[in-house]
Each structure stands twice: as C-alpha cells, then as structure tokens.
Amino acid sequence: MRDPLFKGCTRPAMLMGVPATPLAVCSGTIALLGIWFSIAFLALFPVALLAMRIMIRRDDQQFRLIWLYLRMRWLSRDRTHAFWQSTVYAPLRYAERRQRLRKP
C-alpha cells in the first residue's frame, strides 16, 4: 500500500465527547430557541448532548454519515436524479473526462 490512511487522521475534533460541528449546530439552535421563545429550552441541551453521545458511541463518523445521507437523498436534485431517480456521490462529466484522455 503506497499511501495508507490512518484512522486517527480522519477522526473529528471532539468537545464533551461529541464532534465539534454537530455540537455547535445543536447548541446554537437550542440557544436561539431559548432566546426567541423561552429560557426553558436551554434545559434541552443536556438531553441533546446525551443523545448525541449515545449516537456516536459505536462510530465517531456517524454525524458525517447522516449528513452525507441527507445531502445525497434530499438535498441533491441534479440531472442524474431527474433521469434515473438516483444520486451520485461524485459525478464525472463525460466531456471533461474525454478531453483529459485526449491530452498527451
């Protein structure tokens, strides 16, 4: 294997046992709900933190996989989805590929 991928290199940054990005999104949403409606919404933070810690107990990439699923199934509405009713993780345009193959 020429370029090995080490598991530690792909691990997300953790705060309180939860990846930093989902924690920031969740705590920001709860804080906004607490500001707009009632301070009682802030009591949801420990519950949300516990739920997120339970979710990533087996796999620390779980939130990345959930985001990828949502992006592929619900947010990606390209020509491939319109024609085949499917999604593509990394579509490759045929014209670009053909031009790259022609160049010496």
UniProtKB/Swiss-Prot annotation:
GO terms for cellular component: plasma membrane. It is a single-pass membrane protein. Its main location: membrane. Keywords: Cell membrane, Membrane, Transmembrane, Transmembrane helix. InterPro entries: T4SS_VirB3/TrbD/AvhB. It is found in: Cell membrane. It comes from the Bacteria. The chain crosses the membrane at residues 30-50. The keyword Repeat does not apply. Pfam families: VirB3 (PF05101). Belongs to the virB3 family. This is Type IV secretion system protein PtlB homolog. It comes from Bordetella bronchiseptica (strain ATCC BAA-588 / NCTC 13252 / RB50) (Alcaligenes bronchisepticus).
